[in-house]
Swiss-Prot record:
One Gene Ontology term of the molecular function aspect: nucleotide binding
UniProt modification remark: Phosphorylated.
Cellular component GO terms, alphabetical: host cell nucleus
Keywords: Activator, DNA replication, DNA-binding, Early protein, Host nucleus, Phosphoprotein, Repressor, Transcription, Transcription regulation
GO terms under biological process: DNA replication; DNA-templated transcription; regulation of DNA replication; viral DNA genome replication
Composition skew (Low complexity), residue ranges: 203-228, 236-250
Function field: Plays a role in the initiation of viral DNA replication. A dimer of E2 interacts with a dimer of E1 in order to improve specificity of E1 DNA binding activity. Once the complex recognizes and binds DNA at specific sites, the E2 dimer is removed from DNA. E2 also regulates viral transcription through binding to the E2RE response element (5'-ACCNNNNNNGGT-3') present in multiple copies in the regulatory regions of the viral genome. Activates or represses transcription depending on E2RE's position with regards to proximal promoter elements including the TATA-box.
Gene: E2
Region entry DNA-binding domain, spans: 314-396
Protein name: Regulatory protein E2
Transactivation domain, as annotated region: 1-207
Compositional bias per record (Polar residues), positions renumbered to this chain: 283-297
Broad class of the protein's primary localization: host cell
Length: 396
């Protein structure tokens, strides 16, 4: 085998570039052609990497990038090759695919390592101000792999929290969240989402509880069409109820009578996806809670009273109780897909001793704030038969 020279490397290097140009000019819609293109990209960068290792800085008239750049591009091409080869074995191989839809820019954009088609822009107005806005990209069609590397096709969706898709298990997989940028670039912690002639905004209303004379602020979502007049724009409150307060109250009382009492108290919290939630205190902190918080709040987005109450609390957490195998699989899924929605996860554990609850498995999840905890509970699918207990700890 003859050693490679600069001339032989230049010839092979130019041949791979010629293959790429031919495939680009072909404007094919066949995945096999796109696979050949990325094979040529991989070989081009492998040759460039080898030349750089041999202290060759040019092949022909073209200067070569650094070793780190050629290594990265070669690995990137290998990854895309593997993804296309896998997609070729799926039912979506016969669909119309452009070279741009298999490009590195598309595959590396969120959601990463997924194929996407038909992008659309989602404009987010921080502080509900058009002058303080940022465009995000979502997709009409998203192709993703499950745990068995099988491809599935779904639609890209948008809500007030961010851009997401719903996977085969019914879980909401968020690949873009607006809240971190709202805290970073906004002052009020509020934002408006506009896309496809639709508008989703947070409207602040006030309500009071019979057991507490002080009013509390609640944020609800409203959606509308951007083509309507702002003054006459009808708002549709999320989870709204068109029944009268009297009928809602009577139904709540009936539900309270049907549910069992535990330790002299009644759990009136609505059930979500077959789970029972035991609520901790979400009102003002007690004197013993003051000064024990170990995390720092965002600079904006709280009223003066709300900031004082939140800073006085400990970091919030949720205790999940259920079957051991279900909790283990669920924990692995959460740490993979929803790492941005919590602070830390515990391992699966059990209480011991004669007073334990029959060996039920438990998982603790800690959060940076009450808002993050609420987003987690609203987003993540909880395993069936799992109970939820909200609480706080002095330290983690």
């Amino acid at each position: 085998m003859q050693p490679e020279t600069q001339e032989s490397l230049s010839t092979r290097f130019a041949a791979q570039q010629e293959i790429q140009l031919t495939l680009i000019e072909k404007e094919s819609y066949d995945l096999k052609d796109h696979l050949a293109y990325w094979k040529a990209v991989r070989l081009e960068n492998v040759i460039a990497y080898y030349a750089r290792k041999e202290h060759i800085t040019k092949l022909g008239l073209q200067p070569l990038p650094t070793l780190a750049v050629t290594e990265y591009k070669a690995k990137e091409a290998i990854n895309i090759q593997l993804l296309i080869q896998s997609l070729l074995k799926s039912e979506f191989a016969l669909e119309r695919w452009t070279l741009a839809e298999t490009s590195a820019e598309t595959i590396n954009s969120s959601p990463r390592n997924c194929f996407k088609k038909v992008p659309f822009i989602v404009n987010v107005w921080f502080d509900n101000d058009e002058r303080n806005s940022f465009p995000y990209t979502c997709w009409d069609f998203i192709y993703y792999q499950d745990d068995q590397n099988k491809w599935h096709k779904t639609e890209g969706l948008v809500d007030h929290n961010g851009c997401y898709y719903v996977d085969l298990n019914g879980d909401f997989v968020y690949f873009t969240l607006f809240q971190p940028d709202a805290v970073k670039y906004g002052k009020t912690g509020l934002w408006t989402v506009r896309f496809k002639n639709k508008t989703i905004s947070a409207s602040v209303t006030s309500s009071s509880r019979n057991t507490n004379p002080s009013s509390e602020s609640r944020v609800g979502l409203s959606t509308s069409s951007s083509s309507e007049s702002p003054r006459r724009r009808p708002s549709i409150s999320e989870n709204s109820n068109t029944e009268s307060p009297t009928s809602s109250t009577s139904r709540l009382r009936e539900r309270r009578r049907r549910e069992p009492r535990e330790s002299g108290t009644t759990d009136t919290t609505p059930r979500r996806r077959g789970t029972k939630r035991k609520l901790g205190s979400d009102s003002a902190p007690t004197p013993s809670e003051v000064g024990s918080r170990s995390t720092t709040l965002a600079r904006h987005g709280y009223s003066r009273l709300g900031r004082l109450q939140e800073e006085a609390r400990d970091p919030p957490l949720v205790l999940f109780t259920g079957q051991q195998n279900n909790l283990k699989c669920w924990r692995n899924r959460c740490t993979t897909k929803y790492a941005s929605l919590f602070l830390c996860f515990s391992s699966v554990w059990k209480w011991l001793g004669p007073n334990s609850d029959g060996g039920a498995a438990k998982v603790l999840v800690a959060f940076k704030s009450d808002a993050q905890r609420q987003v987690f509970l609203n987003t993540v699918h909880i395993p069936k038969g799992t109970t939820i207990t909200l609480g706080r700890l002095d330290s983690l």
